[in-house]
UniProtKB/Swiss-Prot annotation:
HAMAP family from the UniProt entry: YciB (MF_00189)
Superkingdom assignment: Bacteria
Topology versus the membrane: Multi-pass membrane protein
Keyword Oxidoreductase: no
Gene name of the encoded protein: yciB
Localization (cell): Cell inner membrane
Protein's name in the database: Inner membrane-spanning protein YciB
Alphabetical keyword list: Cell inner membrane, Cell membrane, Membrane, Transmembrane, Transmembrane helix
General function of this protein: Plays a role in cell envelope biogenesis, maintenance of cell envelope integrity and membrane homeostasis.
Organism: Klebsiella pneumoniae (strain 342)
Keyword Lyase in record: no
Family the UniProt entry places it in: Belongs to the YciB family.
GO cellular component, one term: plasma membrane
Length: 179
């Protein structure tokens, strides 16, 4: 259910874009993201930091898009979010000396420190590359191409990278000696 809720604003954005335009889609995105945040609070009495950060960025960049009637702001939101994710991952590894991915998954998975570091760095690079791809597609290709890339391309890339990360983790998990 939670994964569905995470994708709901994206689905709403896409539907409103196809039915109306980028400004209706942006308005719908802001409203849907707020509804998901409120639902999460009411249902679970908890709002994850990433969900809150995402909402703030959606509200700010979406609000600027609507106020100035300029879609460049909502296009930048994607890259800013990816830059923040990459920055948090790199900061955790290089400054805090403990990869963020390890902080998030370390209780569930026993992996060597080098694996955590590589995985953390790989995700940081992934987010940087996605952010750069977004800049290129958002500002050099037609708007409809960007919307499709944002909804389908980035979602597919993230799913594939998650799968590859899972394979990488599986290959480095301690083996049970009883088999």
């Amino acid at each position: 259910m939670k994964q569905f809720l995470d994708f709901l604003p994206l689905v709403v954005f896409f539907a409103f874009y196809k039915l109306y335009d980028i400004y209706a889609a942006t308005t719908a995105l802001i409203v849907a993201t707020a509804i998901v945040l409120i639902y999460s609070w009411v249902r679970y009495r908890k709002v994850e930091k990433m969900a809150l950060i995402t909402f703030v960025l959606v509200a700010v960049f979406g609000g600027l898009t609507l106020f100035f009637h300029n879609d460049e702001f909502i296009k930048w939101k994607v890259t800013v979010i990816y830059a923040l994710f990459a920055g948090a991952l790199l900061f955790s590894q290089w400054v805090m000396k403990k990869p963020l991915i390890q902080r998030m998954l370390g209780k569930e998975l026993a992996l060597p420190q080098q694996v955590w570091s590589r995985l953390n760095l790989a995700w940081a690079v992934f987010f940087i590359l996605c952010g750069l791809a977004n800049i290129y597609i958002a500002f050099w290709l037609p708007q409809n191409i960007w919307v499709n890339f944002k909804v389908f391309g980035l979602t597919a890339l993230t799913l594939v990278f998650t799968l590859l990360s899972g394979i990488y983790i599986y290959r480095h998990m301690p083996q049970d000696d009883h088999h």
